[in-house]
Amino acid sequence: MLCRNTARTGCKFFRLYHSNPIEHVKPIHIKPLTYGKESPQYKVLSLALQKFVPEHGFSERSIVESLNELGYPSSMISSIGAPNSPSFFHSSTAVMELIKFQLVDKRYRLTEGINPDVTPQYKLPSLEHLLLKRLEMDKPIGGHLSELMSQLAIPSAFLFETAIPELHRLSDDMIYFSNEKDHHDSAWYAKRLAVSSTYIGSKLFMAQDKSHNYKETFTFAKDKLHRVMRLGEYYNNTEEFAWYTLMSTVNLIKSQLVRG
């Protein structure tokens, strides 16, 4: 296990068995996006997410509105979706890229300014703080979360190549950049499954939440995180706990989808 101040060179984008410093480098390109922050694609998708998705949802209209405002031709929408393979289950490769962009961009913005290499662990934010901060980022698109979660849950290459890997990267980052004590054995997986379960459950709750400023969502998230992490401490069999958290997530998704 490399220490956190290990020199970071030759980094490739893959997840190691444990959290590792080389995985959390802030690169010029925000992997797995294939374009940098100065590219037209990034600018179009960033503006679409900030200004037009809150009104029009994850749709081609949001992207076209962004293209128009930035002075790009509407035909550019085809190149925006180019990184994605056409899917029978998803109507637009450009919308798929917009969804991917919001997952990746928010994950990186969540930990901006946090450097575990130089910051004492006790001064790092709590896991709960990062979880709530990530949910806070979705307030502007709260009215479109049901649509988003439905898109992400469609069995497809996009689910297995983008949505699930990004969920695991987010969970890994929330633990790595927090003051949460990590484990370097099989419990590493259990903790990340617990955080993934909490995050997915909170997002599904948020999609149905009618309370002012999503107050009930944040109460739910704090309570669920506490219960899941505490339950993990009581399980001596890490594999059993990992299956418990995984099945909790699957069952919750199924119940929400049945409700429509």
From Swiss-Prot:
GO terms for biological process: ubiquinone biosynthetic process. It holds the Pfam family COQ9. InterPro entries: COQ9_C, Ubiq_biosynth_COQ9. It is found in: Mitochondrion inner membrane. Changing residue 188 to K: Inability to grow on nonfermentable carbon sources. It comes from the Eukaryota. GO terms for molecular function: lipid binding. Belongs to the COQ9 family. NCBIfam families: diverge_rpsU (TIGR02396). Membrane-associated protein that warps the membrane surface to access and bind aromatic isoprenes with high specificity, including ubiquinone (CoQ) isoprene intermediates and presents them directly to COQ7, therefore facilitating the COQ7-mediated hydroxylase step. Participates in the biosynthesis of coenzyme Q, also named ubiquinone, an essential lipid-soluble electron transporter for aerobic cellular respiration. Present with 3420 molecules/cell in log phase SD medium. This is Ubiquinone biosynthesis protein COQ9, mitochondrial.
